[in-house]
Amino acid sequence: MASITQLFDDLCEALLPAAKTHLGQRSVNRKRAKRSLKKVAYNALFTNLFQDETQQLQPDMSKLPARNKILMLSFDLRVGGLGPKADRLEELVEELEAAPCCPLLEVGSVLDLLVQLAGSGPPQVLPRKRDYFLNNKHVGRNVPYSGYDCDDLSVFEMDVQSLISREECLCHSMIQETLQVMEAAPGTGLPTVGLFSFGDPCGDRFERDTRVSLFGALVHSRTYDMDVRLGLPPVPDNADLSGLAIKVPPSVDQWEDEGFQSASNLTPDSQSEPSVTPDVDLWEAALTYEASKRRCWERVGCPPGHREEPYLTEAGRDAFDKFCRLHQGELQLLAGGVLQAPQPVLVKECELVKDVLNVLIGVVSATFSLCQPAQAFVVKRGVHVSGASPESISSLLSEVAEYGTCYTRLSHFSLQPVLDSLYSKGLVFQAFTSGLRRYLQYYRACVLSTPPTLSLLTIGFLFKKLGRQLRYLAELCGVGAVLPGTCGGGPRAAFPTGVKLLSYLYQEALHNCSNEHYPVLLSLLKTSCEPYTRFIHDWVYSGVFRDAYGEFMIQVNHEYLSFRDKLYWTHGYVLISKEVEDCVPVFLKHIAHDIYVCGKTINLLKLCCPRHYLCWSDVPVPRISVIFSLEELKEIEKDCAVYVGRMERVARHSSVSKEEKELRMEIAKQELIAHAREAASRVLSALSDRQMSERMALDARKREQFQRLKEQFVKDQERRQAARQEELDDDFSYARELRDRERRLKSLEEELERKARQALVDHYSKLSAEAARREQKALWRIQRHRLESARLRFLLEDEKHIQEMLKAVSEAHQPQEPPDVLLSVHPQVTSPGPEHPEGGQGCDSGSAEQHSPAWDGWNRPGLLTPQPLKPLAVGAGGRGLQQAEGARPFSDSLSIGDFLPVGPGAEPSVQTGMVPLLEVALQTINLDLPPSAPGEAPAAASTQPSRPQEYDFSTVLRPAVATSPAPGPLQAAECSLGSSGLQLWEDSCGKMDACGSASRETLLPSHPPRRAALEEGSSQPTERLFGQVSGGGLPTGDYASEIAPTRPRWNTHGHVSDASIRVGENVSDVAPTQPRWNTHGHVSNASISLGESVSDVAPTRPRWNIHGHVSNASIRVGENVSDVAPTRPRWNTHGHVSNASIRVGENVSDVAPTRPRWNTHGHVSDASISLGESVSDMAPARPRWNTHGHVSDASISLGESVSDMAPTRPRWNTHGHVSDTSIRVGENVSDVAPIRSRCNTHGHVSDASISLGEPVSDVVSTRPRWNTHVPIPPPHMVLGALSPEAEPNTPRPQQSPPGHTSQSALSLGAQSTVLDCGPRLPVEVGPSLSSPSSGCGEGSISVGENVSDVAPTQPWWPNTPGDSVSEELGPGRSGDTEDLSPNWPLNSQEDTAAQSSPGRGEEAEASAAEAQGGEQAYLAGLAGQYHLERYPDSYESMSEPPIAHLLRPVLPRAFAFPVDPQVQSAADETAVQLSELLTLPVLMKRSITAPLAAHISLVNKAAVDYFFVELHLEAHYEALRHFLLMEDGEFAQSLSDLLFEKLGAGQTPGELLNPLVLNSVLSKALQCSLHGDTPHASNLSLALKYLPEVFAPNAPDVLSCLELRYKVDWPLNIVITEGCVSKYSGVFSFLLQLKLMMWALKDVCFHLKRTALLSHMAGSVQFRQLQLFKHEMQHFVKVIQGYIANQILHVTWCEFRARLATVGDLEEIQRAHAEYLHKAVFRGLLTEKAAPVMNVIHSIFSLVLKFRSQLISQAWGPPGGPRGAEHPNFALMQQSYNTFKYYSHFLFKVVTKLVNRGYQPHLEDFLLRINFNNYYQDA
């Protein structure tokens, strides 16, 4: 057996745990632990060994009672510092003794047992003494202070001292450890191996700086409050401060932690001692730390750097439970029993899941109990599952309990009510609760379908959204989180019912339109609206009122429904409230009144017109309900449209509308006017005929009488003249004889004098002449003698010179003479011969520039020798040329007339001597011209032998050869002209400045001749000498600016010389040439040189070019052109490059389009856009009648980039060509409208609108066409220009015979994919290349382009991959374009082409079948060639309804997400979609408001038509205006005169105001009226308001007791009410007063006139004054009468008529009429506010009546005295007048103020009338 020591060692080893560390614990020192265990073991051993001695020492304890023993143990506890435990023990003992069961003996025994067991437990180590006062062994009191060096304090501070020493050791290596810790390997250098060193106070700097410092003694626990201020304990004054000299290492900088110390509580030592803490902060180092690249075993498989540590829960459920228990124990220890934590109840998770699922549907369980007063579920405290804390489980379960509470409350809220007589909440609330119940049923289904195998967290997550909805619905229904029936502190508002409930739900849906509650609210709103929409449906469609609970908008008063006047309309059906929100929901607020009026109107129509079509119509009505489904919405809109259409059709057949009635009346009125005009014209014509016949008869009589008088006068005049002549002859015969004798004598004398004078003159002149002759002869002899030698010398030289000349002529036949001499003649020839119909445009009057004729190199490449140019300055205005060299002899006998063309029948000149001279001149010119082509002269001779040669003055003395030379070697020479020839030619030509393009074409030699011998009206097209490029208007490479255009003419074989612009030059502001009648166009026809850059060039207008060439182009090759006006090529049989109005390769902008015509086979020349250019903003062309279109028909260049192009409209193309394209080759086209496919039997390249090999997207399909003739583009065209922003010329394709090989859309040199596709041509294409109908491509096919949004046509190579095929948009329709052009027949060329290919129909069918069969293969090839990234067709997630996203209000459903096309979306899904896409107001408007508005408009229109058409409402208004407003002047005048005459006769009221008198007065007035025979006149009657006793004298309202009544029947009395008639009567009464005033003044006038006639009152002063008084009063009354007539009868009536034209329902008619009457009363000053003004007017009226009575009451006095007759009452009348004047001026002031203040602006009319001449203003 081992020794005791060995056994104790083994025991300690067995008890010691394994050597491992845990989180938050220090590493165990095994030696120290083993030592402590041994100490315990030995103590136990020694205690038992010396037990006897200890028992002897102890007193006898058994005799003491158990209570005393327990108190002794309590004292021991107090001594040990466990005071609370001692107190607790004493309390328990006292409670036990005080218990009722205390006398039991067992209690004492049990206490004894407990006392005996008191020390038998394991020894408990007392906690370290942290508090000196708490663990003091002096029980119950505190001992006096004994200094810092006492025992207790030293024991208390032992651990502090150890920590301080350790701190001093750590400070030395702190810097190195801090710097090395970041880069060290994991786990090295740390104070403990544990990861969380909670127990190590040295591991944290905060711990060192606070708890370990001097103030650590003052810190009771870790504090987090920043406002804590630590202070020293109270120390007595006599305390020993020696202990304060402890060296405490100062470690905290005072600025680092201001919350725990400040300068006030720092000791001097800690302030002054320098800090030894290193400056390097570990946290700063951690922030700036960069992860090491080192890898170690802890980081295998992890990237270097920081890694998240695992969560505590990852250690497992048991570890988490232990950790929770540990912390709960710590909390209980710290709280000391104050914190009573609930006892944890561990429940299995499966049971808890069952309880959770139960409580979600309101089922009580052990975990969830229901609090009945609060109707809320309560979670049992302490419930938890393994692996989760009770708090987390409680928070999760409390949420679930809240969901259950909401469910329970909503279930109680939505219980089906008992429908008895006490129920008053209405149908809307029932529908709402039913919708709520349905939602709760779906919720229960969700809960019950949840599998119980899910975890708590999963269930909580799954039901979070439903729980939120339940909570929201509970709050919506008023049964939310707060207790039911209370809202905060006050009572909760009652839940709305009826209409207010719908408004409440609608507003809530609007507020929640963007969250998850929106669909639930929409569902509840839809369900709740069902009863209301049913009520609205019945009320609006049929007028039926069904409201069992009185919750809707209308209340019925049955007693008023039996009335037949306005009360039926106003009181039969009444709105329940004046507030609109109380009557209708918010979403129908804007049509609430319309709904109300619509039902009333239908009931009125049923009552008044039971056979009305609205009452018996069987047209099905559209339903009214809240709808969120797209399909149903579309169906409702369709139903509304169908319903409205059918009802309008029924209305048209069964009734006449107001508009139709007005139209019929207008038509009848116009017909009446026409008949009246015809009758008037007939009468007028008869009158005019009669007048004309009378006038003619009278005129004949007058002429006859005049003729007789004239004859008599002539005879008498002749007789008198004869008598006078005889007298004159007798008187003057003797005088004549005397005058003749004197005249003869005088003439004889003058003759004698003249002869004498002439004899003297002759004598002296003869003498002087002889003297002069003698003198001259003498002088001549002297001079002859002097010059004899010189004369002889001169004669010899002259003879010698003549001999030399003769010799030279005989030897040399062609003398060298520069062409300048001959050229100088040309500008003078400005008038062409008769064969030039275009005028002399070849000879421009401006300055021209001449060039030396070095042109042989053009036609003869081998002779291209550079020659120096001799430019000649040309004078302006045809002055002739100043030659650079000296003058050469030119024979006088050679005139310019020899060069002029001879007429067709002219005889040859007989002067034989002139012929050699002309020959010499022509030979001289011909030296500088190139030789003609071989075979040209014979052809000329053989073709036109009878026609003499003509001279074309557009060139220099060039004979016109109307021949057709066969193509010979010259063609080869021309075609071989390459770039080297061009370069040599440019070198030889140089550059010159041009002043006029006319002379440029005129003065340059050119060959071969290009003018055909054409007479007027005749043209002989001949064959073309192809390929001549010899004609250029300017030297190649020239630079020309501002050159006027030439107009080349009649050139059979054009030359380079015909071009007015040099090749390669840069031209600006050049007006283009207009080439004409070019049978075989050449490069010479081009008005633009090759390679030049041109801007601002006006286009040429080429004409009649049978074979167009490059020369027809008005744009230079390769130039840069802007602002080019287009050409208009015409009648080109074989179009060529020359027909193009845009330069090849140019940059063109802003080009206006051309309109080419009749091109059978167009060429490249027909293109109005350069090849390869980039064109934008193009106006489209409209090509026409192109049988075989060509590249020239294209309105888009090859390789260009086009945007914003309007589509072309190609027509009738049997064999389409490239010319029909609307898209350029190689372009990038966007937004191009589709091309209309045409009747193309054999499709061509042009039929495709998609490039070869291009990627195409968004292509609108056109009709496929099939092409059997596929041309290969020839290789002679050159591409490669870029022209931005060009408006291209889009020519009309020109007529050209088929088979022109130069008709190309592409070239070999172009960068195109057609060349690559060449080998892939089908086999059948080969033979078709030579067929006559194979044009070169008519299509909109761009080579190498990238096209998007292009309207494609069918591919033109059926089997070629790289093209794209689309289906047809429609049969020949493109957009809204419609081809209105006639179907022109095919021309003869097409007929011959059709005849030459007999199997054309079979070929077409075969090619069609082949093309259809090749489409699929083509598409497959295309799909294989392009692998496009496509949208996914369907995903599983995409087949579900989409989650609402941010663009929900914006994106339509079609663009939101792609869904599986096989999934047919149900109505509910579309409802979800539509609620996402459309806002709620829009949905309500389209589902409810739309059918309501449609039917309401129908009903209102029917009611308005019924009243206006059937009841003739407007005729009643007019009758009221005619009679009661006195618009009928005859009626008003007659009525007033009859009444006032009886009144003025002094009749009493009884005599005047009886029915017989009044009826006779009225009937007489109606007989005088214009409208007395109308049926509405029978409604008039005169009635008495009251019977006055007497008529008041001078009272203007003497007849106010009388009124004119107008009877209005049902149902018109709804609109024309009694109140309206009374207002009419008020206006009538005032108008009657005006009539009384007029009658009184008329009576005054009558009396004054009668008195003046009887008493001769002309000289009376008073009479004159009374006339003036009467006149002023009459003016005033007439002003008021005119004002009333204008404002009431005209202005107000016109406004009323305009308003009636726009009324929509009966209410509007009623309002319009009431407003009309109100305006009439207001403008008539009959309102209460205008009473003061009316009082003034009444006073003035009484003064007028008073004036009358004063005048007629007494007779005038006798006319005695100087003042004439006088009236006795004149003073009274003058006083009345003065008062009248005062009142009228006062009225003027009052009215002026009213107008100025803007109160009654209509009174401006009154002011203008009364003060027209400023009478009142001046006064």
UniProtKB/Swiss-Prot annotation:
The answer to whether the entry has keyword Repeat is yes
Write out the ranges of the repeats annotated as sequence. 1027-1053, 1054-1080, 1081-1107, 1108-1134, 1135-1161, 1162-1188, 1189-1215, 1216-1242, 1243-1269
**Compositional bias (Polar residues):** 1297-1314, 1384-1398
Cite the record's note on assembly: Component of the gamma-tubulin ring complex (gTuRC) consisting of TUBGCP2, TUBGCP3, TUBGCP4, TUBGCP5 and TUBGCP6 and gamma-tubulin TUBG1 or TUBG2. TUBGCP2, TUBGCP3, TUBGCP4, TUBGCP5 and TUBGCP6 assemble in a 5:5:2:1:1 stoichiometry; each is associated with a gamma-tubulin, thereby arranging 14 gamma-tubulins in a helical manner. Gamma-tubulin at the first position is blocked by TUBGCP3 at the last position, allowing 13 protafilaments to grow into a microtubule.
Q: Where in the cell is it found?
A: Cytoplasm, Cytoskeleton, Microtubule organizing center, Centrosome
Query: Would you say which domain of life the source belongs to?
Result: Eukaryota
Its job: Component of the gamma-tubulin ring complex (gTuRC) which mediates microtubule nucleation. The gTuRC regulates the minus-end nucleation of alpha-beta tubulin heterodimers that grow into microtubule protafilaments, a critical step in centrosome duplication and spindle formation.
User: What keywords appear on the UniProt entry?
Assistant: Cytoplasm, Cytoskeleton, Microtubule, Repeat
**Which residue intervals are annotated with compositional bias (Low complexity) in the record?**
1321-1335
Which GO terms label this protein's molecular function in UniProt?
Answer: gamma-tubulin binding; microtubule binding
The molecule here is called: Gamma-tubulin complex component 6
Q: Which GO terms describe its cellular component?
A: centrosome; cytosol; gamma-tubulin complex; gamma-tubulin ring complex; membrane; microtubule; spindle pole
Q: Does the keyword Repeat apply?
A: yes
| Cited Pfam families | GCP6_N, GCP_C_terminal, GCP_N_terminal
Q: Where is this region: Disordered?
A: 810-889, 929-951, 1000-1023, 1271-1412
Similarity-based family: Belongs to the TUBGCP family.
Q: Name one GO biological process term.
A: mitotic cell cycle
What is the disease in the record? Microcephaly and chorioretinopathy, autosomal recessive, 1: A syndrome characterized by microcephaly, cognitive impairment, underdeveloped retina and choroid, and epilepsy in some patients. The more anterior parts of the retina, near the periphery and pars plana, have a grayish hue and diminutive vasculature similar to retinopathy of prematurity. Visual impairment becomes evident during the first year of life.
Query: Do you know which InterPro entries this protein is assigned to?
Result: GCP, GCP6_N, GCP_C, GCP_C_sf, GCP_N
Give the region (9 X 27 AA tandem repeats) as residue ranges. Answer: 1027-1269
Q: What does the record give as the organism's lineage?
A: Eukaryota, Metazoa, Chordata, Craniata, Vertebrata
